[in-house]
Amino acid sequence: IVCSAVLFDLMIGDEKAYPDLLMGYEAAKSASSEFLSGCNGAGTGATVGKLLGFGNAMKSGAGYHEISLPGGLRVGAYVVFDGEKIFAGVFSRSRKKIISSHELMLSGITREFSGANTTIACVITNAALSKAECSIVSGMAHDGYARSIRPVHTTMDGDAIFTMASGEYETAVDTVGYLAEDAIRLAVIDAIKNTETMGGCIS
């Protein structure tokens, strides 16, 4: 089974520029242990703050954060954030300021959410986990989304988290899940802090 997920990124750049076989080979050859944040890879077309339409969106991207414990346990999270609000959000071009999506909704904005709000992530750890335990970690890690993104987990979101474990470190699954939650939260913040203006969307 090969798991996969995508986010809507067709509003920035050439919407017909689909990845092809050659790009797959180039990506594999360029693989390294360095995680690139900001407008790289899947983060190139990621945006936030679309509650009032794409014209009010801001730029987002990819983010990474790793937590390492003294005993040797490592839990990292790589996130591509394509949603509504965090440190970035709905940008009012007329008022030249960021507007809170939460406050807009409380003020009576009832616009239907688009299908362009998705956050996907991968939790990577050296813990020894079974497939079932990886699923538990992914579930717990979703709380990291809830702690950093508003709104989140709507019916139009394709939010997903995959967990990979290398099996080198024996520890409790709940410990990994707890650390994964915080790693996800901080990776979302990293995605916003390391982005840049692109395609008419300011950072």
Which residues are covered by each model-predicted region?
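A structural signal for small-residue-enriched, beta-sheet-centric alpha/beta enzyme cores
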Residues: 1-203
